[in-house]
Amino acid sequence: MASKRALVILAKGAEEMETVIPTDVMRRAGIKVTVAGLTGKEPVQCSRDVLICPDASLEDARKEGPYDVIVLPGGNLGAQNLSESAAVKDILKDQESRKGLIAAICAGPTALLAHGIGFGSKVITHPLAKDKMMNGAHYCYSESRVEKDGNILTSRGPGTSFEFGLAIVEALMGKEVAEQVKAPLILKD
């Protein structure tokens, strides 16, 4: 079986933990993860001033698609940048048309709203993004820590980053693999 592939789209102002933790968890599961810089391959300044070096520019990473999952980290400015990007819209529309998994955390799901993705799905966001996400009644809101509805997987925020990453692993590779990845992480049940 060919290995699964993930594209994490990294925008200026992204939440560091929501980028790095799911990326790490997916890589531990053997998923080939590409962290793509929205505006290029240069280091990206995140919401808490941590710099993350992308593996590729989004432009180059798109040429290597399709991916099994597209991941959108949160962070208010990061989510705004994802929401304003025509390239992100095109990638998400293509992923949705192929019924591929789309995963977004914290404020990241607001990019789904901005680009008209997954309307009718049950979603979760950071509590501060709930009102924006529910504007227009395009989604059903969940109070879960992680919510998967069809091919849309969403989560609350930095504190749910491990659960979010493990949910992506489970969706792509099954519960057994997710449990194997989880065990050595010493997470609180």
From Swiss-Prot:
It catalyses: N(omega)-(1-hydroxy-2-oxopropyl)-L-arginyl-[protein] + H2O = lactate + L-arginyl-[protein] + H(+); N(6)-(1-hydroxy-2-oxopropyl)-L-lysyl-[protein] + H2O = lactate + L-lysyl-[protein] + H(+); S-(1-hydroxy-2-oxopropyl)-L-cysteinyl-[protein] + H2O = lactate + L-cysteinyl-[protein] + H(+); N(omega)-(1-hydroxy-2-oxoethyl)-L-arginyl-[protein] + H2O = L-arginyl-[protein] + glycolate + H(+). Its EC number is 3.1.2.-, 3.5.1.-, 3.5.1.124. It is a lipid-anchor. Signal peptide: none annotated. The modification Cysteine sulfinic acid (-SO2H) is found at residue 106. Keywords: Acetylation, Autophagy, Cell membrane, Chaperone, Copper, Cytoplasm, Endoplasmic reticulum, Fertilization, Hydrolase, Inflammatory response, Isopeptide bond, Lipoprotein, Membrane, Mitochondrion, Nucleus, Oxidation, Palmitate, Phosphoprotein, Protease, RNA-binding, Stress response, Tumor suppressor, Ubl conjugation, Zymogen. The modification N6-acetyllysine is found at residue 148. Sumoylated on Lys-130; which is essential for cell-growth promoting activity and transforming activity. Undergoes cleavage of a C-terminal peptide and subsequent activation of protease activity in response to oxidative stress. The active site is at residues 106, 126. A lipid is attached at residues 46, 53, 106 (S-palmitoyl cysteine). The modification N6-succinyllysine is found at residue 182. InterPro entries: Class_I_gatase-like, DJ-1, DJ-1/PfpI, Prot/Nucl_acid_deglycase. Gene3D superfamilies: 3.40.50.880. Its main location: membrane. It is found in: Cell membrane; Cytoplasm; Nucleus; Membrane raft. It comes from the Eukaryota. The modification Phosphotyrosine is found at residue 67. Pfam families: DJ-1_PfpI. GO terms for cellular component: cytoplasm; endoplasmic reticulum; membrane raft; mitochondrion; nucleus; plasma membrane; presynapse. GO terms for biological process: adult locomotory behavior; autophagy; cellular response to oxidative stress; detoxification of hydrogen peroxide; DNA repair; dopamine uptake involved in synaptic transmission; glucose homeostasis; glycolate biosynthetic process. Homodimer. Protein and nucleotide deglycase that catalyzes the deglycation of the Maillard adducts formed between amino groups of proteins or nucleotides and reactive carbonyl groups of glyoxals. Thus, functions as a protein deglycase that repairs methylglyoxal- and glyoxal-glycated proteins, and releases repaired proteins and lactate or glycolate, respectively. Deglycates cysteine, arginine and lysine residues in proteins, and thus reactivates these proteins by reversing glycation by glyoxals. This is Protein/nucleic acid deglycase DJ-1. It comes from Gallus gallus.
